[in-house]
Amino acid sequence: MGGSSRRQRSTSATRRDDKRRRRQCFSSVADDEEETTSIYGVSSIFIWILATSSLILVISSPSSNTSIQSSSYDRITTKHLLDNISPTFKMYTDSNNRNFDEVNHQHQQEQDFNGQSKYDYPQFNRPMGLRWRDDQRMMEYFMSNGPVETVPVMPILTEHPPASPFGRGPSTERPTTSSRYEYSSPSLEDIDLIDVLWRSDIAGEKGTRQVAPADQYECDLQTLTEKSTVAPLTAEENARYEDLSKGFYNGFFESFNNNQYQQKHQQQQREQIKTPTLEHPTQKAELEDDLFDEDLAQLFEDVSREEGQLNQLFDNKQQHPVINNVSLSEGIVYNQANLTEMQEMRDSCNQVSISTIPTTSTAQPETLFNVTDSQTVEQWLPTEVVPNDVFPTSNYAYIGMQNDSLQAVVSNGQIDYDHSYQSTGQTPLSPLIIGSSGRQQQTQTSPGSVTVTATATQSLFDPYHSQRHSFSDCTTDSSSTCSRLSSESPRYTSESSTGTHESRFYGKLAPSSGSRYQRSSSPRSSQSSIKIARVVPLASGQRKRGRQSKDEQLASDNELPVSAFQISEMSLSELQQVLKNESLSEYQRQLIRKIRRRGKNKVAARTCRQRRTDRHDKMSHYI
């Protein structure tokens, strides 16, 4: 009984304890439910906002007073966010936090090891989802991090200077040549620097050698100097040349720019010269190199003396003594050595009379060149040289011209006229004269009493025959006239080149072989390659007997440089070359065009007749 009663009491006590525990547990659970319900209500709101709108909560920057509250608030918010989201996102967040802590720990170790971080921005430990940018704090961090390294900036042409709150102000460390940097436009030196840099960039792109700025400076000066020798420089190039030359030759003209220094230096040198003794012999040697007024006076005095040192350089002072203050006519001494045909003629600048000139002149004209040595004079003296020895296939004939009038021949400036006439008092020749050597000579006398002689077999050679081709009329003063003859003509031969003078076809229908006008191989050939012939007009102005055309007579009457046959047969380029001659008058040019047109018409008519004859012959052949 006793055991059972004790067992019942323990059972009832156990039941009472269980009831008591149940009541305590129920009260605690109720309290917990109230607390969790309120918290679960707040967390559900955050979860709904994050899930529906995917917004990132941006909270303003916390102040220094509320730093503790913000940190506790961050912890509470993070706890509830991580407790009420999915397990996958919670695992992802935990892994990110662990990785972020590992990275911060590793970065802290590297910073402790290196002494300074390689990053210039601070590392903020903030959870995901809450971010803000504190510009003021970051700017303070950058400014307090230490001296900022200067970055070399190339000059750039800008309209206005950059205006930025983070920009640095003007400093003397900038790589520029401007002294005052508050100006928006660059200086001239900046522009020159930009030009040099541009040239270097272009040279680098092209793969050529990059020239240094100093070399470019001298190269520009050298280029302008070379250009000034060829063509005149422009105003801009002249200004640039002066600027470059001033900079290049600044050291050379430095002592001459300072007049006071120069005067003082000369005064010191003169004082040293006046002193009887010198301390150093080297100073005496240096002073002897400089010439002063006294030395120049001694030099001029030595020049004026006959037995001076400079006069000993002249070997022929006895033959040609020095004459001072003389005119040109008094100073020129004419003798056989320096006398030429051009000096022999009377000129407006020469007051020497022709009568004072020695008359010992040969039949052959002297040389026109200024060579008066004995070897050259003997070379041009009359010798038994025929043209075939020099030109084997030539048809040249020497034509000597003599002045038979009493008036003196005056030079008109033409070489082919000056050297051809000689002032000799020979009598006029008859129309047909037999020379002393038995050679036939035939002459033709013009109205101006100038005799033209053509020789059959030449014993003299005229070296100036190729220079006698002139497009200008041979005119002189009123005292004499000019009439010339060329032995070579495109259709007419010289009367002395054949023995059948009585033939009516002579000089008209029987031209000599090789005397026709030969067209030049190149249309750009010079005027000297064209053989110029001229028909000699008769004294009465009448046409010759035979089939001489009207155009040939017009060409000879108007002194055209070429014949009518040449005008009609020459190429267009050669015709333009003849028309460009400045010595031709407008009437002569019109006459040349007229003869050309009629010559072409004659050729066309001849071709037409030939075609008609050929067609008639073919028809008769078939019939």
Curated annotation (Swiss-Prot):
Phenotypic effect of disruption: RNAi-mediated knockdown of all isoforms results in a severe reduction in transcription of gst-4, gst-5, gst-7 and gcs-1 mRNAs during infection by P.aeruginosa or P.faecalis. Susceptibility to P.aeruginosa and P.faecalis is characterized by a decrease in survival rate.
GO molecular function: DNA-binding transcription factor activity; DNA-binding transcription factor activity, RNA polymerase II-specific; Hsp70 protein binding; RNA polymerase II cis-regulatory region sequence-specific DNA binding; RNA polymerase II transcription regulatory region sequence-specific DNA binding; sequence-specific DNA binding
Region (Disordered): 1-29, 158-184, 421-451, 467-557
Top-level taxon of origin: Eukaryota
Major site of localization recorded for this protein: nucleus
Keyword annotations from UniProtKB, A to Z: Activator, Cytoplasm, Developmental protein, DNA-binding, Mitochondrion, Nucleus, Phosphoprotein, Stress response, Transcription, Transcription regulation, Translation regulation
PROSITE patterns: BZIP_BASIC
Impact reported for S245L: In lax120; small body size, transcriptional up-regulation of genes related to metabolism and adaptation to starvation, increased length of the reproductive period and slower growth recovery following starvation-induced arrest at the L1 larval stage
Subcellular location: Nucleus; Cytoplasm
Residue ranges, compositional bias (Low complexity): 435-449, 472-498, 511-529
Record protein name field: Protein skinhead-1
